């Protein structure tokens, strides 16, 4: 059972890296659906990583590395800040006891968290949030 957890997690981590790398140009274009999908996927994979003993620092390093190719330093910092909020939220959650004995339950919890984060993101206007933040920093 543990091998199944590790294989699924490895695949999700690889997918998250690819997703974040592909999302950088899309994020710059303020695409709501893609950005919210990234947030949901980050929440899901971060929770799985946490169950497997990955540190919050490890999770943030994934976010920071994903922004390396961004041309706009402001957007890069905003991306790190917003995604950092997702990582922080995951590390504030209570974890179920003995997740290795409840693989299906903790994977369902991670998927549920990802869906909730995605749905909440879709209710906000990402484009307006970024515009407001940019105006606040560059009057």
Enumerate the predicted regions with their spans.
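Compact alpha-helical subdomains of small soluble proteins
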Residues: 61-139
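Bacterial N-terminal signal peptides that target proteins for export
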Residues: 5-15
């Amino acid at each position: 059972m543990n091998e199944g957890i590790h294989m699924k997690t490895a695949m999700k981590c690889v997918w998250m890296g690819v997703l974040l790398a592909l999302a950088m140009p899309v994020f710059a274009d303020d695409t709501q659906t893609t950005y919210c999908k990234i947030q949901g996927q980050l929440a899901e994979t971060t929770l799985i990583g946490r169950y497997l003993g990955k540190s919050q620092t490890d999770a943030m390093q994934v976010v920071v590395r994903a922004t390396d190719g961004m041309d706009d330093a402001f957007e890069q910092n905003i991306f790190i800040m917003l995604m950092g909020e997702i990582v922080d939220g995951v590390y504030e959650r209570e974890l179920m006891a003995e997740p290795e004995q409840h693989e299906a339950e903790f994977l369902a919890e991670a998927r549920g968290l990802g869906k909730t984060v995605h749905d909440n993101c879709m209710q906000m206007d990402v484009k307006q949030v970024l515009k407001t933040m940019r105006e606040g920093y560059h009057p």
